[in-house]
Amino acid sequence: MKVQEIHKLLGNHSQGTYIDIGAFDGIKVNNTKYFEDIGWVGIAVEPHPTSFAKLESNRNCIKENIVIADHDGVSEFNWSDDAPMTSRVDMSGQKERIHDMKDVVKQQLPCMTLNSLCEKHNITQVDFLKIDTEGYDCHIINSIDFKKLHISFILFEMWEHHEELCYKLAIEKLINNSYLEVTKDYDIAFNDRFNRYFLKS
């Protein structure tokens, strides 16, 4: 789904708030730059140090060099300059993917939940949330307190072959919080390769 289609679903508003979790350099394979360019405000989160340095110079939004997790504190982050877009939080079920990376650095990074990030920046309404954390997306969704944070549109990657139960619970949680999965024709139950799109009804 093109970002312009998402914007249309959100009413083509000229003002809004986005959060980009796993922003990489803020340019490549990125769909929040569009919203920044039309005047929206937001936060871009990228734990990979080399990618974050590029993000700092590429974007004008708030930038956070942290891990978004299912808890506040510290998290082990595995990264490599050999594959910066596939670095990830260390967790069970992802070990084989970490081993595929060369020259892996294991680093302890500060982490917080999405709710804590939004509280830090006094955000209660998010119009567009993008999550791309190479297999950790479902954990982030399952940790969101939707009673405290209103999110209009959520885009995330689906790695169900690694975390089948986690993603099942995440989708159930979204449905139970009045989200509908969006298709190219704006119906439900469309899987765009790895990406899943949910709109608050």
What are these regions (language model features)?
Residues 1-201:
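Phosphate/nucleotide-binding beta-alpha loop and adjacent structural elements of enzyme active sites
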